[in-house]
């Protein structure tokens, strides 16, 4: 990943639309989304397609657009570039978890993969839910619903996080 003499220049693809992935990468780089320069492409699928078709292409994306949900491997034509988390100039064994979606999800869940660029997602409401059906749905998300999280490409909550969130529903 260099532009030293004798090396080809990378083609950077970024989002042309506002999105959480760009916001988090901006934060990770100490910038904002608008500071990320490159060829603007619309949407997560657009970034993936642009990188797949350009041998010198590089971009960022949400995990579900980098890894096939069925095979749990990176999509054909995409290579996931690891982050040197401890900034020692190499990818140590503890940082090399990109071979499968499951190992990436575990690294995110355990806090090994940094946040940002990883981020939590929340359900929000104006005040506490008043309808029992809404509360029951939120409880389902925190219990039975957790078994569907990984297959949808998201990271399951830790048991202690679930307990904290369940307590808020009482």
Segment roles from a protein language model:
Residues 1-170:
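Exported/periplasmic ABC-transporter solute-binding proteins
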């Amino acid at each position: 990943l260099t532009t030293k003499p004798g090396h080809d220049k990378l083609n950077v693809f970024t989002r042309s639309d506002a999105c959480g992935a760009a916001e988090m990468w901006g934060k990770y780089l100490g910038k904002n989304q608008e500071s990320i320069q490159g060829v603007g492409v619309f949407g997560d699928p657009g970034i993936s397609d642009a990188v797949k078709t350009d041998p010198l292409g590089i971009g960022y994306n949400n995990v579900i657009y980098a890894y096939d949900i069925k095979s749990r491997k990176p999509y054909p034509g995409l290579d996931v570039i690891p982050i040197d988390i401890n900034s020692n100039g190499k990818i140590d064994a503890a940082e090399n978890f990109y071979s499968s979606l499951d190992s990436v999800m575990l690294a995110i869940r355990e806090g090994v993969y940094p946040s940002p660029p990883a981020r939590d997602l929340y359900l929000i409401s104006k005040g506490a839910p008043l309808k029992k059906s809404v509360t029951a749905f939120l409880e389902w998300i925190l219990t039975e619903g957790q078994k569907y999280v990984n297959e949808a490409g998201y990271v399951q909550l830790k048991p202690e996080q679930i307990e904290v969130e369940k307590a808020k529903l009482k």
